[in-house]
């Protein structure tokens, strides 16, 4: 068997050893192992999830051979849970795999305590009543839940957890934490020791842009009552001031300074989002507070004291044109400041842990260090219960989506994916499931959908007429290509939740295979 670092080399580059460790200790339960569930679990098994338990009471049918790669002709008539479990185990023998041959709807009703043993439950192809019951069970047991369903050419993914906190959110774009407009004493002292008017051309061409911009910002502030540029005109004047320091037109370090000038104009202090997290009621910690909120409480203290209104410094520097000496010196200054901030935070975390009666060493140094490095990018996600969303959706958002042509497909499928469950409850079949009933089923489905819209406070709205016929043509089929996409997105969100890295999707993700669109609805 390959060593973990070799086996998982590529993904370790994405979520690191801490993330991989979280995956390898996680326990996942999958309800229904049709193509959607099998595809979701396949991705997690290959990624090295700790253990899986499949719950499915059905037998493999001939129809399964056309849309599920985790069964074969030899398995027809055998337990689907056992068959899929066996094939998945072959993909990664380090994953513990179990199966339970029972109908998930029955298990939800008869043995709710079963789910408390898992880190996360993936529930696929459940009808509305079962989703509501399972969500209630998982919330009471503090187990994360991801709901997924593929239905013809549409499908959805919906996360349901009380609260999810993420430290390593890894945004696509973020501003380098260089503090060019609020340098601390050591950085200021080093910058002041460098002369921008040095006569030697080679030396002038290798002054890093951090030094150039801090010096020019200081000069600007001296002539503008201590203020930095704020208007477009002032920003252009600032850039002209940078240009005036150039000796020749080919000085790449000054060109870098001009391109990075916007970093001087960035607002100082902390973002509104981080302020909101600091003022969250959970930041008033107690003996049952999570590690995240203990560190937030420490961050709040840090900002008010040694941070001087700022979060801990990240400590990393981007590449830039510079002499080796200047770059290494700057690197040391940034690293030393980040380390000092970390040590201050560590002491505050320990002090708070003692105060609330927890073990002062219960939060590891790497965790605190990661928190400090990502303190500008923290995220707190809270999700409504499925029951709340179904019983009292946001009418403001609903009206907005129904009135917006761009969302007509997504909101239409959202309504109809609920309507087909009501249809099945009334007629004991899904619309279009049997040949020859499409027109009648479409009419009955429309009646149910309009009734549902009325219950949701949306009288007078109509869905696209063709969607009723499309839902009947789907016949509740799980098409493999759609199941693979929905399963892939499901596993992606599961990894985000377990590793606590990246930001999980908010609301209900809807895939519209007819228009080749995917959108999220927050209701």
UniProtKB/Swiss-Prot annotation:
- Determine if Nucleotide-binding is one of this entry's keywords: yes
Q: What pathway does this protein act in?
A: Protein modification; protein neddylation
Q: Which GO terms describe its biological process?
A: post-embryonic development; protein neddylation
Q: Name one GO cellular component term.
A: nucleus
Query: Any idea which UniProt keywords this protein has?
Result: Nucleotide-binding, Nucleus, Ubl conjugation pathway
Instruction: Classify the main location.
Output: nucleus
What SUPFAM superfamilies does the entry give? Activating enzymes of the ubiquitin-like proteins
> What family name appears in the similarity comment?
Belongs to the ubiquitin-activating E1 family. ULA1 subfamily.
| Name assigned to this protein | NEDD8-activating enzyme E1 regulatory subunit AXL
Q: Which organism is it from?
A: Arabidopsis thaliana (Mouse-ear cress)
């Amino acid at each position: 068997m390959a060593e973990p670092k070799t086996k998982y080399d590529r993904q370790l580059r994405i979520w690191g050893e801490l993330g991989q460790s979280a995956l390898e200790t996680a326990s996942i339960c999958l309800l229904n192992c049709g193509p959607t569930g099998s595809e979701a679990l396949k991705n997690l098994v290959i990624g090295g999830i700790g253990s899986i338990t499949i719950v499915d009471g059905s037998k493999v049918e001939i129809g399964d051979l056309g849309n599920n790669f985790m069964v074969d002709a030899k398995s027809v008539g055998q337990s689907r849970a056992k068959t899929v479990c066996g094939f998945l185990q072959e993909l990664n023998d380090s994953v513990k795999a179990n199966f339970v041959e029972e109908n998930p709807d029955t298990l939800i009703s008869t043995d709710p305590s079963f789910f408390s043993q898992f880190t996360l439950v993936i529930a696929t192809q459940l009808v509305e009543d079962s989703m509501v019951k399972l969500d209630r069970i998982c919330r009471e047991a503090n187990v994360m839940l991801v709901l997924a369903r593929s239905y013809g050419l549409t499908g959805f993914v919906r996360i349901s957890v009380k609260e999810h906190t993420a430290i390593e959110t890894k945004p696509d774009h973020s501003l380098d934490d260089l503090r060019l407009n609020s340098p601390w004493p050591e950085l200021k002292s080093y910058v002041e020791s460098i002369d921008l008017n040095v006569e030697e051309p080679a030396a002038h061409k290798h002054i890093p842009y951090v030094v150039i911009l801090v010096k020019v910002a200081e000069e600007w502030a001296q002539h503008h009552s201590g203020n930095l540029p704020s208007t477009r005109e002032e920003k252009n004047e600032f850039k002209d001031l940078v240009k005036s320091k150039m000796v020749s037109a080919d000085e790449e370090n000054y060109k870098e300074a001009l391109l990075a000038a916007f970093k001087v104009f960035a607002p100082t202090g902390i973002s509104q989002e981080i302020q909101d997290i600091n003022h969250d009621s959970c930041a008033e910690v107690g003996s049952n507070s999570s590690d995240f909120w203990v560190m937030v409480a420490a961050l709040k203290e840090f900002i008010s004291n040694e941070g001087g209104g700022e979060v801990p410094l990240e400590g990393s520097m981007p590449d830039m044109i510079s002499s080796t000496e200047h770059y290494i010196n700057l690197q040391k200054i940034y690293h030393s400041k980040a380390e000092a901030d970390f040590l201050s935070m560590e002491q505050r975390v320990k002090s708070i842990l003692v105060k609330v009666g927890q073990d002062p060493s219960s939060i590891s140094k790497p965790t605190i260090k990661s928190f400090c490095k990502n303190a500008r990018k923290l995220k707190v996600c809270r999700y409504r219960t499925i029951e709340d969303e179904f019983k009292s959706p946001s009418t403001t958002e609903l009206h907005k989506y129904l009135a917006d042509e761009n969302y007509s497909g997504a909101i239409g499928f959202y309504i109809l994916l609920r309507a087909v469950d009501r249809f099945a409850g009334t007629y004991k079949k899904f619309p279009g499931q049997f040949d020859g009933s499409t027109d009648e089923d479409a009419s009955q489905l429309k009646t149910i959908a309009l009734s549902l819209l009325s219950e949701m406070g949306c009288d007078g709205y109509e869905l696209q007429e063709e969607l009723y016929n499309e839902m009947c043509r789907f016949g509740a089929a799980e098409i493999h290509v759609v199941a693979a996409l929905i399963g892939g997105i499901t596993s992606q969100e599961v990894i985000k939740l377990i590793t606590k890295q990246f930001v999980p999707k908010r609301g209900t993700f809807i895939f519209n295979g007819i228009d080749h669109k995917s959108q999220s609805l927050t209701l």
